Amino acid sequence: MSMFLDTAKIQVKAGNGGDGMVAFRREKYVPNGGPWGGDGGRGGNVVFVVDEGLRTLMDFRYNRHFKAQSGEKGMTKGMHGRGAEDLIVRVPQGTTVRDAETGKVLTDLVENGQEFIVARGGRGGRGNIRFATPKNPAPEISENGEPGQERELLLELKVLADVGLVGFPSVGKSTLLSVITAAKPKIGAYHFTTIVPNLGMVRTQSGESFAVADLPGLIEGASQGVGLGTQFLRHIERTRVILHVIDMSASEGRDPYEDYLAINKELESYNLRLMERPQIIVANKMDMPDSAENLKVFKEKLAANYDEFAELPQIFPISSLTKQGLATLLDATAELLDKTPEFLLYDESEMEEEAYYGFDEEAPAFEISRDDDATWVLSGDKLEKLFNMTNFDRDEAVMKFARQLRGMGVDEALRARGAKDGDLVRIGKFEFEFVD
C-alpha cells in the first residue's frame, strides 16, 4: 500500500516580468531616431490543475518548491520580450488550497480539469519608448519587471465520496466496504486498522451506484487531535450521507449506545455542519449471540433520549459476514442520496474568486522604523514594488523614484520622525543618504 499523504505545505513563486529596455533608433537617414526600447514579457503564473488520475498529495512530499519562469527582457525596435509559459502543477480531486500565512481558503478543487492561478506572474517592465514626452523625447529610463507573486500554501486533500462509513475502530467498517464494493482494504482485529481512507463503488440491485469511503476509526477526542485526530475527520466533510456503523455484539465490552453518542460528539465538535448530514445507523455483527438483545436495548435508549419532535434515524440490522440485510441497506442509502443535496464546504464569501496579487489598498503605502545602527528603514508593499521596478543603473530612473517617494509623503514622514540631513535610509539592501 502506498503512503497516503493528505496534507502538504509548499512554496510557489511566479515568474518575474522581464525588464524593459533602453535603446535608441540609429539609422542612416533617421537623424532623430528617438527611443526604441521595448517592454519586457510577462512572468509565468503558477497554475493548479485537477488531475483525476492522482489519488494523494504524495508528489508534494519531496517536491515542495515550484517556480515559474520569468519573462524575457524587452528588445530594440520596440519589440516586447516573450512572455513566460505558465507552470502547471497537477493536484488530485478534492484538494483545498489555503494561504498558509492567513489560513484563508483560496479555492476548493473538485472537478477534473479545474484550474486556479495560485501565484500570478509579474508584468513586464516598460521600455524607454513608453516614457517619451514632448519635454523629454529621448528618455534614458526603463522599468525593471514586476516581481512575481510568492506565497506559502497549505494543501488539504478531502476524499470525494457520496457516503462515509464512521464508527469506532474494529466495528467492521472495512469488512463492510470489502463486501459491498470491489475495494480490498487491509483488515485486522486491532484499533486503527484503517490508517488511510479506502474508497469503493457500490452498485445496488436497481442499478444505482455511489462512492463509499471507509474512514479511519474514531476515538473520543479525535476532534481535538487525539489519536489520529482531525487528519481523518476532514474526509467526512465531502460526504452527503453518513453510515454510522455500530458493533451490536459489544464484543470489546463497550456499550453500543455510548459508542453512538461518542462518535456523534466528535463529529459535532469538529464541524457543526457534519451533523446536518443525514445518518443511517448500521447495526453490524447481528450474527453474534448477544446482538439482538443489544439492538433492542439500543432502540429503547435512542427513543428515550431523542427529541420528540425530531425524526429518529433509520436503523438497519446487518451482518457483513453473512451478508444479512445488505441489499436493503444499500437501497435505502441510494434513496437517501437521491434527495440529499451536496453540502458546500465553504461559503462563497470565505473563498477568493481568484488569488489576490496586488498590494492591500487598506495597508499603509509605507512604514518607517529605525535599526540598531540608527539607519532609517522603509518598508511596505507599494513602496517595495516601486523600488523593485526601478532600474538604478539609469540616473533618470533614480530621479523618478525619488519623485515618487516625495509624492507618497516619505520625505515629510522622515522629517517628522526626526531624520536629519545625511542620515542613512535603507530600502531592502539599498542604502542612500537623506537630503533635507
UniProtKB/Swiss-Prot annotation:
UniProt binding sites for Mg(2+): S174, T194
Domain of life, per lineage: Bacteria
Location of the OCT domain: 358-436
Keyword GTP-binding: yes
Cofactor: Mg(2+)
Compartments (UniProt record): Cytoplasm
Residues holding GTP: 167-174, 192-196, 214-217, 284-287, 319-321
Domain Obg: 2-160
Keywords linked to the UniProt accession: Cytoplasm, GTP-binding, Hydrolase, Magnesium, Metal-binding, Nucleotide-binding
A single GO cellular-component term on record: cytoplasm
Pfam families the UniProt entry points to: DUF1967, GTP1_OBG, MMR_HSR1
GO molecular function (one): GTPase activity
Broad EC category: hydrolase
GO BP, one annotated term: ribosome biogenesis
Domain OBG-type G: 161-338
Enzyme Commission number(s): 3.6.5.-
Matching CDD domains: Obg
Cited NCBIfam families: Obg_CgtA (TIGR02729), Obg_CgtA_exten (TIGR03595), PRK12296.1 (NF008954), PRK12297.1 (NF008955), PRK12299.1 (NF008956), small_GTP (TIGR00231)
Function, in words: An essential GTPase which binds GTP, GDP and possibly (p)ppGpp with moderate affinity, with high nucleotide exchange rates and a fairly low GTP hydrolysis rate. Plays a role in control of the cell cycle, stress response, ribosome biogenesis and in those bacteria that undergo differentiation, in morphogenesis control.
Assembly information from the UniProt record: Monomer.
Family indicated by similarity: Belongs to the TRAFAC class OBG-HflX-like GTPase superfamily. OBG GTPase family.
Designated name of the protein: GTPase Obg
Annotated organism of origin: Streptococcus gordonii (strain Challis / ATCC 35105 / BCRC 15272 / CH1 / DL1 / V288)
Record lineage: Bacteria, Bacillati, Bacillota, Bacilli, Lactobacillales
